Amino acid sequence: MEHLLTRRQLLAGLPAGLLLMRGWAHGLEHGRAVLGYQLDLSVLFNFLTFSLTGTVVQEVDRRAGRYQVTMEGKGTAISTKTEATGIIRDGRFKPVESRSVHIFRGRQNTSTTTYDYEGQRIELHAVTHTLLLGRRRQVDGVLALPPGHHVDDLVSTELNFASNTLERDADGTYHTLVVRRARAEDEGPDDVSPDGYQVELVPLRFRPSPDVATGRLTALVDITRFSSWARSHQPARVTFAPDRRLESMQSSLILGTRLSVRVTGNA
């Protein structure tokens, strides 16, 4: 799925990555599963509301050492399709390519990211539009894969966490690197660079702990790594099922915006 997520792409894209749904315990080992999801978003204190319902098709072939995730969803004035493929090496999921097409309020947003492990580089090309004014953002960037460090997308991050192959510190904090559009920390929702954008690697860290009431693992995740509409002092709250699949997510964003995702089970 796309890694340079605007708020719109966060709406369309998260289900294929962080939201690889509980209920895929067997598919994670080997096989195919088709799952559903529901995503709701309100903007400007409910002045604008959007809902997206869709399916995620997940295929893992451990014998061949590869995986593929395809996500499609539709809602009022929005449709999305994302295909993410990767390889499995020494038990770890590693992204190879992600292609996304999102149509939102009549505007098409596209993104392609490739990970070249032989050439030791990441390449990303994207054309997106801001939500409120529809301003065009173009991203064309190449990065070197850092020696001795793993780089993930949202799909491989969730897969590695679920299979307990994501890197973990002694204090229980999981971490990896993800690629995003390089931007100023105080970027506004309709700010656009006339010179286009490069890309950068940023750390993604979260520390799950059991909820006192339910016993479910929960974590606060800084999604500024994926959306300029997020703020680091308002991390998203995610809840995981016993098999370490994401069960739900709630997030407060800027301009009175709220994002909620929930698992709807097998499609």
Tell me the role of every PLM-derived stretch:
Residues 26-117, 165-267:
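Acidic, serine/threonine-rich low-complexity disordered tracts
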Residues 97-143:
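Surface-exposed, polar helix/loop patches in the mature regions of secreted/periplasmic/lumenal proteins
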Residues 2-3, 9-26:
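N-terminal export signals
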